[in-house]
Amino acid sequence: MKISVQNFGIISDAAVEIKGISLIAGPNDSGKSTIGKIFYSLIRGLNPDEDIFISEKNDSIRRFYQNILKILRDNKDIDISIYQTSRINDEWISKIESLAENFVGTQKKQLIRYCKFIKYQNDLEFNSIENKNFEIDDYFLIEFNDDIQPIFNEEKITSIFIEDLEGTATLQYNFNSELNKNINIFFNNSFFIESPSLIDKSLQDSILYEKRFSRDKKSHLKFALANESNFILDDENQINEIDKIIKIISEIINGRIVVDDFQGVLYEKNGQEINIDNVALGIKGFGLIQLLLKNHQLNSRTLLIIDEPEIHLHPNWQVLYAEILVLISKKLEIPILLTSHSPYFIEALKVFSEKYEYEENLFKSINPIPWCSQSIQPLNHFLFLL
């Protein structure tokens, strides 16, 4: 999958392709994290959940239906029982539209507007371009809080060109997303790791109470850390490779992170159970990857996005973390998008990519004029970028 982004917040233009391990390197406030959030929003927005779609659609129709009945109750001349129904179809909508002609002012306008909303929701299809636009809008709102318009030139149009094995499409954004065509993409899921600090006692709640689906990236990740995937892995070679990498991680951190509905969230080290609140973030960083692998949450169609993993890692562990990621991506065919400004981490990725004969993919944040917006472009080799 490749995206070309123009005039998105701080970013003037960027072209980033997911290929094995892709690394965006550059200083803080250069748009690195923005690209990761765009990928996350697009992948999840273009893969809506059908059960959630049906539930939210029915909730929306029910809400407008109740608003209509509330208006009708205010008119004592109307027998409301005639209009109460469990089948809100075109025939029922036509009755309400005809009845609205007997109203005046605000109530008439509201009845007509509510009927239009219900009709639109009734006609909305799960895999339609309209629904995908709504989904992308929801993710953009969560991730960017509407801070999407170009910062340095508000007159320019925000656009994203999406290129995938399944086809191409252009998304333009002007306070709402507008795809020029309905596109299905290869990736069907994504996880975004910002900080390992979310590994805490609340992970137990993700087993007992957390909803299976959430648009919030932290809740989405926490559910995956606490629950096994529905993805059925029957490839013995893959299972063996996963077990090997989990074992390597266990050796690095001298133990493992356990999430259990009875025991809670623990760090097991040399047979001892340690309160997760007393565990270093570096250990949690490795444990997070360990849990995703154990729960079979990662596969070739799931993009793993990790934002500046070096922040909570000692330089020596940055090197080991880089090796783990290269092994995961090569041995398990897991696509990974990374951002970093650490020379230790960047160089380690280069070294281990060469050691394991694995392709790396580097992009650099470029800002020739300090007060202008950022450009992110591909490089053919690794550089220290601090």
Regions found by a protein language model. Name each.
Residues 1-49, 266-386:
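Switch/communication elements of ASCE P-loop NTPase nucleotide-binding domains
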Residues 4, 45-295, 299-301, 369-386:
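Phosphate-coordinating catalytic segments in nucleotide- and nucleic-acid-processing enzymes
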